[in-house]
């Protein structure tokens, strides 16, 4: 099976790339700008190019067809329109990575299926993903463009730790705070349910969709079946670090008032209780089951992080903001 990944080195796509490289019968090419290609398996063909330069990519891929094109780095409608122009008639399946944050907010029911309405007034990122889906489904209905839409939720991997909020430089600063006995912020009272999924589990399901005729024209989400409260998530991270984290609970409204850009990630995503019904992916990929519990996966992720000083990026601006918010919230904030 001849496959092209646009991207191929991120949290989600990197795990898929590594798993495919270990399997027979797959001829994988990744197309990206080459900035993160150091750990690509030797069997994977690499093309350096900017997918946003349509003429350049058309020339690079001239004469090539693919069984599957996997798009991991399209975020706005113009990018998927470009892909339709580039790949219509040249691929048998086009898999678009959307987002489970596209689902209705606030939810009318906490159990999410693929038929849950798509609407997110709180986050432009999610609205753009919805618009991308609409473009692709219109192309499927009108011209038969062979799209499959995949909606991940909160997926993590080696070195990436799933937190409710963190600074622009990643999760390390909050991990460091936990290790040093400093408090960290948990939005709300920490009792809302959330789902985190290890990238290796996600990859297994994604690979089962490759070339799958039953997935054409279909949206499907891929998540773990494990539901945890945010308190549990932080406590499990603390256990893996060998510490009891000091959690300070602060309302999402207050956090957004102090940092408006948190509205999307919180009200549009992580402050909602969500439970995913994964019946559809299990029907499309018989035998799939997310098998990595969070307490297992996060230990592996933290072990990787501790061995990589280049990922241990201090974020003094975020650190100071967290201290400032906790001071402002006291005594209205309560600690666990």
What are these regions (language model features)?
Residues 110-114, 119-134, 154, 164-172, ...:
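Short-chain dehydrogenase/reductase
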Residues 143, 157-173, 209-220, 243-244:
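Glycine/proline-rich active-site loop of Rossmann-fold NAD(P)-dependent oxidoreductases
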């Amino acid at each position: 099976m001849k496959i092209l990944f646009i991207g191929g080195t991120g949290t989600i796509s990197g795990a898929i790339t590594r798993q495919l490289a270990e399997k027979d019968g797959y001829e994988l090419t990744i197309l990206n700008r080459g900035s993160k290609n150091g750990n690509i398996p030797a069997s994977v063909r690499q093309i350096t190019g900017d997918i946003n330069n349509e003429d350049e990519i058309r020339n690079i891929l001239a004469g090539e067809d693919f069984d599957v094109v996997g798009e991991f780095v399209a975020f706005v409608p113009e990018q998927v329109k470009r892909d339709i122009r580039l790949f219509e008639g040249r691929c048998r399946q086009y898999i678009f990575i959307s987002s489970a944050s596209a689902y209705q907010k606030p939810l009318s029911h906490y159990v999410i299926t693929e038929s849950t309405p798509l609407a997110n007034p709180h986050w432009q990122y999610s609205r753009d993903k919805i618009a991308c889906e609409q473009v692709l489904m219109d192309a499927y209905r009108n011209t038969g463009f062979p799209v499959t839409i995949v909606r991940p939720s909160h997926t993590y991997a080696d070195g990436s730790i799933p937190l409710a909020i963190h600074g622009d430089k990643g999760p390390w600063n909050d991990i460091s705070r936990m290790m040093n006995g400093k408090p960290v912020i948990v939005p709300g009272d920490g009792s809302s349910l959330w789902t985190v999924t290890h990238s290796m589990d996600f990859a297994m399901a994604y690979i089962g969709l490759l070339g799958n005729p039953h997935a054409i024209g279909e949206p499907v989400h891929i998540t773990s079946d494990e539901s945890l409260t945010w308190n549990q998530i932080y406590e499990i991270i603390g256990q893996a670090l060998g510490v009891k984290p000091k959690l300070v609970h602060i309302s999402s409204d207050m956090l957004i008032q102090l940092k408006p850009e948190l509205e999307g990630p919180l009200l549009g995503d992580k402050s909602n209780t969500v439970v995913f019904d994964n019946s559809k992916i299990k029907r499309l990929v018989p035998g799939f089951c997310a098998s990595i519990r969070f307490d297992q996966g996060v230990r592996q992720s933290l072990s990787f992080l501790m061995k990589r000083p280049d990922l241990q990026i201090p974020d003094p601006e975020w650190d100071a903001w967290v201290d400032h918010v906790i001071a402002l919230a006291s005594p209205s904030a309560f600690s666990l």
